[in-house]
Amino acid sequence: MHPIEAWVNDLGHTEYKFEVVSDDASYRKYYRLILPEDKSFIIMDSSMQVESIYPFIDVSVRLLKAKVQIPRVYSQNLEHGYLLIEDLGDIHLADILNKQSHKLLYMKCIHEILKMQNADTAGLEEYDEEFLMFEMGLMQEWYLDQHLWVRLDDEEQKSLDSVLELIRDEVLSQPHGYFVHRDFHSRNIMFAGRGKVSVIDYQDARVGAITYDLVSLLKDVYIKCDREKMLDLVLEFKELKGGVLKDVSDEQFIRWFDFMGLQRHIKILGIFARLKIRDNKPLYVQDIPLTLEYIKDVIDIYDELKPLEAILDKVAEKA
């Protein structure tokens, strides 16, 4: 008998069936536990990395205290890394977005970001200078070197290093110290029952920049958001946040937002390539073109990013 089945039996369930919900980009798997009378739960299987269950529980408590909508945890098996959690259904943000619902749904999500930013951050790891650079380094290590087999010459390397340092400095110049979900995008935002927003996959949270989760939401690499509508929502967030942003110009805040997005998308290029090469998950490569599109959109706006454009143009033939 599989350990999950044994655990479910120990919970007192004898009639049930499983269905795979998600085998995501990480080491976690999700199954739907279907009981008689259409009652169901989700089992989060972290058995490949059992210790990861502790951050999930820790961050869950932080978010509940901040009144963020998250799935309830009903039971846990710390030995094997299993959690029995609330089944929120199968409706993600991307499934219900349309021209009519666009702003309403995104504003619901923005309000969840504002609540998350009130969560306790004590003891969480920081999105510091070293980690920002490490993440951006994934692009060269996995996307350029191993996915495209492109090597930069000395001048190109200097140009890339200079641009990455510029991005890092711009990110670090904005207000920090906020709870950061890190993957607050359409596949991690659920809608269940009367339009209630629920947030999932938050266990890798850190402390970071004020724009990070806003970027994850509005510059989502799985769905394209029109820039005019995007900036309208960016400024809605700025207005609602107030406080530390009260004396920040709209132009400056948009610049912070764009450079934060650039950092994130450069990292994602590396992660998608790594998922294919190291983890044998090639499907994510199909999302690289939109990721590159976001990067090029920002390069077109800010002249100081042109050296990055030259590098991307060089590799375009192999991309």
Predicted regions and their residues:
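Juxta-kinase regulatory segment immediately upstream of eukaryotic protein kinase catalytic domains
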Residues: 1-13
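Active-site acidic catalytic loop and adjacent metal/ATP-binding pocket
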Residues: 29-34, 116, 166-214, 221-225
